Amino acid sequence: MQTRLTLLVLVAIGALTINARPAAAQQTLNFSLGYFTVRGEDARVEGDVLNANRGIFVFDIDDFNGATVGGEWLVPLGEYFEAGAGVSFSRRTVPSVFADFVDVDGSEIEQDFRLRLLPIAFTVRVLPLRQTSPVQPYFGGGLALIAWRYSESGDFVDFQRQNAIFPGRFVASGTEPGPVLLGGIRFAGDSVSGGFEVRYLSGDAGLDRPFSILEANPRIDLGGWTYAGTFGWRFGR
């Protein structure tokens, strides 16, 4: 389903730009819509709270994968380079239950885990075929400031009070720097552009002790891959 949707997006982008004239070097206001996948269980930072929680709760790491949207301002630096500044947003709420405990009435002990990411990225791209080509493959990288928020809310078990069940809500947030790598292809006309991009983001942040009874210094891995279709409005000379 995801592959079919990606093909449809690329066909639509090609239809919009195939008859356009090759573009001179221009600024671009770029918009993206795609799918963000968090780093897998074996690739996550040591002490990651999601990996630790899987020993107690029932959920999968890839339950945190989901849609992402973004916007970016791109400025040419000569014919072969381009600088960008942009922001993207993703949020995912994952329902869970305790794996080995139930309430006194036999019902599940339920909670929600929520991860929100808002990376602000500053990047530089290399365009081997130049800005004036109607087909523009590119690659590059840069630095992102990742504004994040992670929360756990619902019912929990107090293992120090004879497994008493209590309602709780734990929230942490902050901003962490991290590297970003990207690559893609763009079909460029005089006034519009479109394409497809793959982006990798890396970063992690520390959490307080209440977020994990299994880790003395729990962390949250903020990294992952983004696969997105892009559409841009080109202006200026």
Give, region by region, the residue ranges found by the protein language model.
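Predominantly the C-terminal beta-signal and adjacent terminal strand-loop region
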Residues: 44, 92, 181, 186-237
